[in-house]
Amino acid sequence: MNKILRRGIYEEDINFVGMLLFVTCTAQAAVPEDSAAFHDKYQLQKMLVLSRHNIRSPLGETINKLTPHKWVKWTSAPGELSQKGGELETIMGQYFRERLVHDGLIAENEQPAAGKVRFYANSMQRTIATARYFSSGMLPVANVSIEHQFAPSQMDPVFTAAFTFMNDAYQAKVMQQIAAKGGKNGLRGIGSGLADSYRLLEHTLDISQSEVVGSKGFKGFCTDDIAIVLENHKMPYVLNSLKTAISASDALVLQYYEEEDPVKAAFGHDLTIEDWKEISKPKDNG
């Protein structure tokens, strides 16, 4: 069995790359639902899994100025995998171990020979750590090495969504496609679509009492100031209200997963699941 696990990729038998994706020797699309009859008829031979890192701490310190409240005490440095993220990723690995043992792709407590299993991760602390926790759950008695191209923390080009080509015509085409997401109003339409999220973010953060309002003159998230920058050899990035809202949205959602009490996670506000979905929109669409 020649396996390459690449938090990354398992080529030949199993692949682990980013969001969960299963590939069998047949087309699952032909089967409307997961059924016992299907499993009796087909044998899993290969699997490809694409996965991002698990829960991390927020990326920057801007969030401290957006609310008068204290954020949770993060268990890791900014942008690094949190303790909760490690726990959850171990559980994820255990789930895959049970599934793969059940389907006969690996043995219980398998110890693959050297070189038969490879874990390849992006060279960020959060991704290397995610791969390590996942491997401990999936292969708990195996001495697995985690491969990465650079010393932490540097982005591996394999995983970087940076432009490798740019000219005026291409830039205009990309901007046109982005603006189309806002309908006939273009970028303003994107901003308008986030209006409810912006207001809920302001309310949850109690942003009117924050440092950014008191010292910076910030008056709230605007729906009409979206700016997008496209440059060669860089990832696309946004400016102004959406940039700040993405940071706030990201931090609140991470706090929701890190803090067991959802009311505490929302700084004393009793939010519904639908509210949390609304809060997550800026980071999901940004």
PLM feature spans:
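Bacterial N-terminal signal peptides
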Residues: 15-24
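Signature for phosphate-centric chemistry
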Residues: 29-116, 122-286
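Bacterial N-terminal signal peptides that target proteins for export
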Residues: 4-16
